[in-house]
């Protein structure tokens, strides 16, 4: 196992700062997740913690829960509702996305908004050159990756119910403005190079 595998793959006990009311979650799942039946065990995934991610397991099923982190958040950051909406829409168009079981935007359940999706087994390849695989296996993975990307770009976002998702046009301008504001909101000290970059980017955006 590589150092990256050991650090970022698998699960660990839930960190104290990220624990929540398990009984409240079980009540919500009983009401909103078809086929759910406890008892439930909860572990925290080692990686992917911009939005804390948990593995939920019962005697008959496994799920993944992603939630907003607790505490004060920057505006528009950690929008788990957007993740849920896009993956649900793509899955309904036949794209290989995990099944979405439900979204909860009621902070009173476990403290922050969250959604629950199916747990899907998979492999993580840290090196894009795939040096440990046979040439024919590498070729198959690259071909599958290209086919999946082509499938994604072939989906009609209007037909998928995402016609009102985001704002059309001026993506770079809006992104630069949003991230500049968020940087300033989180700034703890003045960094001249960053201020210069914030001034430079709008003038040179594609």
PLM feature segments, named:
Residues 2-36:
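Juxta-kinase regulatory segment immediately upstream of eukaryotic protein kinase catalytic domains
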Residues 39-200, 204-206:
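ATP-binding pocket architecture of kinase catalytic cores
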């Amino acid at each position: 196992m590589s150092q990256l595998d050991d650090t970022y793959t698998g699960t660990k006990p839930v960190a104290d700062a990220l624990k929540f009311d398990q009984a409240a979650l079980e009540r919500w799942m009983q009401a909103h997740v078809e086929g759910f039946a406890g008892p439930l065990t909860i572990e925290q995934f080692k990686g992917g913690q911009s939005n804390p991610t948990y593995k939920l397991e019962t005697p008959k099923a496994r799920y993944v829960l992603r939630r907003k982190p607790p505490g004060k958040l920057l505006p528009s950051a950690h929008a788990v509702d957007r993740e849920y909406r896009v993956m649900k829409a793509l899955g309904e168009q036949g794209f290989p996305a995990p099944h979405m079981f439900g979204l909860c935007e009621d902070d009173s359940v476990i403290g922050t908004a969250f959604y629950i999706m199916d747990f899907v087994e998979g492999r993580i390849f840290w090196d894009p050159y795939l040096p440990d695989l046979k040439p024919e296996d590498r070729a198959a993975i690259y071909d599958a990756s290209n086919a999946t990307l082509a499938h994604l770009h072939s989906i009609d976002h209007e037909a998928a119910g995402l016609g009102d998702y985001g704002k059309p046009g001026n993506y770079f301008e809006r992104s630069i403005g949003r991230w500049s504001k968020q940087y300033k909101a989180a700034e703890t000290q003045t960094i001249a190079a960053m201020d210069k970059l914030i001034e430079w980017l709008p003038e040179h955006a594609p």
